Amino acid sequence: MNDKKILFFDIDGTLLTPPPFKVPEGTSRALTKAHENGHLLFINTGRTKVMMPSALSELHFDGYIYGCGTHIYMDNKLLFFRTVPNLLCKETVDLLRKYKIEAIFESNTEILYDGASPAQSEFGVKMRKEIPMVDITKFNREDACTYSYDKFLVHMLPDSDVEKFRSFCNDHYTYFDHGDGIWEVTQKGTSKATGMEFLLDRLSIPKEDCYAFGDSPNDLPMLKAAGVSVAMGNAYGGIEEHCTYQTSAVDRDGILHALEHLDLI
């Protein structure tokens, strides 16, 4: 067995298959063996804590980085958190209405939507049926200063003013364009990479002992910051060009093959 390493895993497309969102048996077996070998295992996801899939509940992880670096836990203890300031939250909601852009806001404890937005689509209706959400308009004048979120997802519609919102995002946020009008918008200064680097510093683990596994453009900061980076076989957006190794797809035991190839199990 090699010396102890620290491993960071994206969720969607890396540990979980596409719908119905299952953990492949080979992945479960590989993670169990890696834990038995003494390696530290962390989830590093764009999802906020409230959006954690139940399919991962039976797997062992030493900690979690949620919301692209906005909440960091280890051994069930919160080590770091950062949310979007309330004034910026309110400005963002106002501009999303003005620019006719649909949005879903993600915090550590709840998912919000804007029932007063002029931008409504079947996509948003479907999401609200699948995921419990709170209408942001419930926050009236008295408690409007009490809400915040960590990141948000936007859905561009045919009449959305995309370029004006892009300019606003460039000033205040970081965003990832996932195609089909879907953007993932995150806080400036936090990312999967900053979350990972926080833990490396806290645990005094050198970069060369850090391994990262992902499949999408929002994994790129994490993959670039790791000592060893692994792109899944189903990776997109050209991220494999920046990785040490590309394994097979998530539903073809990509994690199992990668951990074996890297002599971690």
Segments and roles (model prediction):
Residues A34, T45, F152, L223, ...:
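Residue-level signal for inorganic ion chemistry
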Residues G26-E122:
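Active-site phosphate-binding/coordination module
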Residues K5-P20:
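Asp-based phosphoryl-transfer active-site loop
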Residues V50-S54, K164, G195, P221-M222, ...:
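Phosphate- and divalent-cation-binding pockets in alpha/beta enzyme and binding domains
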Residues A225, S229-I265:
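Asp-based, Mg2+/Mn2+-dependent phosphohydrolase catalytic module
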Residues N2, H39, F198-D209, L262-I265:
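Glycine-rich phosphate-binding loop signature in dinucleotide/nucleotide-binding domains
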Residues L59-H60, C68, F168-H172, A225-A226, ...:
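Short, structured coil segments at secondary-structure junctions
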Residues Y99-F213, P217-A225, N234:
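Conserved acidic, metal-coordinating active-site core of Asp-based
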